[in-house]
From Swiss-Prot:
InterPro entries (alphabetical): Kinase-pyrophosphorylase, PPDK_reg
Single GO molecular function: ADP binding
Similarity-based family: Belongs to the pyruvate, phosphate/water dikinase regulatory protein family. PDRP subfamily.
Taxonomy, superkingdom: Bacteria
Alphabetic keyword roster: Kinase, Nucleotide-binding, Serine/threonine-protein kinase, Transferase
Catalytic reactions on record: N(tele)-phospho-L-histidyl/L-threonyl-[pyruvate, phosphate dikinase] + ADP = N(tele)-phospho-L-histidyl/O-phospho-L-threonyl-[pyruvate, phosphate dikinase] + AMP + H(+); N(tele)-phospho-L-histidyl/O-phospho-L-threonyl-[pyruvate, phosphate dikinase] + phosphate + H(+) = N(tele)-phospho-L-histidyl/L-threonyl-[pyruvate, phosphate dikinase] + diphosphate
Function per UniProt: Bifunctional serine/threonine kinase and phosphorylase involved in the regulation of the pyruvate, phosphate dikinase (PPDK) by catalyzing its phosphorylation/dephosphorylation.
HAMAP family named among the record's database cross-references: PDRP
Chain residues that bind ADP: G154, V155, S156, R157, T158, S159, K160, S161
One Pfam entry name: Kinase-PPPase
EC number: 2.7.11.32, 2.7.4.27
Name used for this protein in its record: Putative pyruvate, phosphate dikinase regulatory protein
Amino acid sequence: MTLKKLNLHLVSDSSGETVISVAKSALKHFRSVETIEYVWSFVKGEEQIDKILEEIERKSDEHNFVICTITDDGLRKYLKDNCIKLKIPYRAILSHIIREISSYLEIEKDEKLDLYTEINNEYFQRIEAINYTINHDDGQNIQDIDKADIILVGVSRTSKSPTSMYLAYRGYKVANVPFVSEIPFYVDLAKLRNKLTIGVTIDVRRLIEIRKNRLTSINNEGNNIYADPRKVEEEIKEAEEFFKQNNWPIIDVTQRSIEEVSATIIQYFNKI
């Protein structure tokens, strides 16, 4: 298969995360495209756009595509008009949404937004969430577990850690605690009151498969308990009963991606 090459110019008046995310989602549908991404962040004036256009002109014999999330109408029009002159495909992905909301609610959009401060606050909130989550992985530092936004509880190998880190990147402080069969739960349940605590479960056969693979990867196939079908089934049953006793929502992660599981957790969080 011959790969087609595309220079993708992602233009934003903020950090560029939105336009990058949208572009990645779109490009997943084109495995035959080799993409070079040019991210132009914090674009606030025509001079910056002129530099972008100069870069595009230097590659005029190649395939170029512009996607932007500039919210300033005048600046966005300046970019669009010049892309038309250069015969470069151009798409704005926020302006239509903003316009539709404005029209539907019959209100004008806010013109003066301190986006720089907002972005800085989001950045530091995310860093704080990531640090908290790393320090509260696998039952560590439970003395201040009540500072978590979300607590995940589940038996070993139920994707608690990767799910926690994904949520942390979204700005949530997450603690995850292992549930170990026949051992008393060592977290003070009083600290979990009024906190979103999720019980994580999985299909028995799938967990056995995951645990066997784990034992193989660490050359410990001789462990007859960790992946024993009867023990695993009892462990999951005991965990689920414990979750129900505490009225915690239960999420089955069998054959579900980290993104899907996280989206469900965020839905629960938004209902609090």
